[in-house]
């Protein structure tokens, strides 16, 4: 197993993902679980993928009729639809043609994660075991067996993390192939940033502060090593060129990317379904103040009063709504605190605004919708709760709730098994950090993943969205947790042998 080369391992990862995705889209959905099938291998609950498909078909038809001048990479802000339309134009309008692409993206991400873990374990067989949860968890079928933006995002994040690890190694240790690794790190950043730009551009805005702080730390480490005469000036110069190149990319990304589209991109599909029409909503809520309207609450009371005569229904609905209006989340006016730097205050304000969008979005998996942020201190106070949610949600009392679609209900049951595994290995992540506490890689990975997850925990009140959005980060931590578990077992065996 230790003689297995990276290319062959990538092919194993690819073939596994390809076969599972093909089986789901060509066999299971059409013939076994047809009530989950929306046609063309798409899940009825995968509203994002269905939407991408429809937009792509329309755009491909427009290109045929009017030429490429009407083409858009992001029609309606959706890059997966723009990419799909090209394939639909030249090949066939069927999302199942993307199975090789989604499989390749997932296999590549799994291989790089394998390389991360193998830096510490130095054993390919054990490192493969660590990557298995990332590779095989059923929740990743939302983007491996469906056409979605998350495949691009996942690989983009892992490529950026790979670049940071390479530069951290160059700064901290004596590394072979110094020039090659410098170029690989810059190339990895470029590819990662491009994939994030395609998938979720706002992540670049979140990643940028961490990258800048890390490079400041590496700059200090390099200077210390230089004054100790542990590094030659040529190596330092090349290292600084790499860092400056990446910082240039980061600065440009920060200018052209912002938090716009955060809510639209991560809104959970299960929470977009509503049987009430816009006309019904307007009639029922005609006399309710605009800032107190809630389609989901009104819909609930509409169902309750289904047998009440029409002439009395609206009055009863309005009276019932008055009683629950006090529980509707209220927006908090933002307060600028002078003792915080402007860039911190402005970013905190952006996060508060994004959270507001989730608080009022409704949905069956909404959590803490009554909590909003009025200043930076509010965010800091909520941080422990955000950590609890982002690491541990969905909680056991949510595992057996009913989803908006049968497929979502099934996914909640599956998430219960996944969460048990995640809980177990996160415990050993603590041991892994302690065991490899002198290795810079474990710190870069752990802090980076925790940082991004905390940002998500602060703003995303929808557990369904959060579960999908955090996948890359929490599964990286789980992989290192599995590595910690392996080392813990080996240490116990050695202790028993010695005793």
Description of each model-found segment:
Residues 119, 173-184, 226-230, 404-405, ...:
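Membrane-interface helix-loop-helix junctions at transmembrane boundaries of multi-pass membrane enzymes
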Residues 48-93, 199:
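Short hydrophobic/aromatic helix or loop-helix immediately within or flanking a transmembrane segment
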Residues 1-32, 240, 499:
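Start-transfer (signal-anchor) and selected internal transmembrane alpha helices
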Residues 96, 113-136:
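Transmembrane-helix signature of polytopic, membrane-embedded enzymes
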Residues 84, 100-120, 424-427:
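Transmembrane-helix motifs of polytopic, lipid-linked glycan transferases
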Residues 386, 390-395, 401, 412-439:
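Hydrophobic, aromatic-rich transmembrane alpha-helices
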Residues 141-142, 176-207, 212, 243-246:
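Membrane-interface alpha helices of multi-pass inner-membrane proteins
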Residues 145-151:
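Short acidic/glycine- and proline-prone juxtamembrane loop motifs at membrane-interface regions
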